[in-house]
UniProtKB/Swiss-Prot annotation:
This is Late promoter-activating protein. Keywords: Activator, DNA-binding, Late protein, Transcription, Transcription regulation. GO terms for biological process: biosynthetic process. GO terms for molecular function: DNA binding.
């Protein structure tokens, strides 16, 4: 299943490296069984304005292949592996661009600097020491008061 040209236009404006969209688009159009090296060479000619790296193409092909939104034939009998993409649900692309939804507490922790994280981890120890010192002071104060009464 191919995406419409509007999605492609959006993708071309916002990047300079090859994306999964261009890889899937070409593979679905041609229905060919290709290795990452062969595909990278073809994509360099198809998209001269984009940076095409063989390793990047291979990693993106693997990501598409293991996705539950794709139908991909992988030929493991040869090295390098060869891939043939039969179909790809647009949900694959929507999932990768969707904003991550984290709990607010976890989101704050993700945005903390290392110093803030260390202070936050150290805070219970500081509170425990203050509580222990307070209890010890009260014990000394009341301990002296009871011994003076006896």
């Amino acid at each position: 299943m191919l995406l419409n040209w509007q999605g492609r236009h959006f993708m071309e404006i916002n990047h300079s490296r090859i994306t999964s969209y261009e890889i899937a688009d070409y593979m679905i159009r041609t229905k060919s069984l290709l290795s990452a090296k062969e595909l990278a060479a073809i994509l360099e000619k198809e998209y001269p304005h984009l940076d095409v790296d063989k390793r990047d193409v291979y990693l993106r092909l693997k990501a598409i292949a293991v996705s539950k939104y794709s139908s991909v034939l992988i030929d493991d009998s040869t090295r390098p592996r060869r891939f043939q993409i039969h179909s790809l649900n647009p949900e694959f692309f929507r999932r990768s661009r969707a904003p991550r939804r984290f709990d607010e507490k976890l989101q704050n922790e993700l945005y903390m600097t290392q110093d803030e994280k260390e202070r936050r981890e150290h805070q219970p120890w500081v509170m425990a020491r203050q509580l222990f010192n307070k209890v010890a002071r009260q014990h000394r104060h009341y301990g002296n008061a009871t011994s003076a009464r006896i």
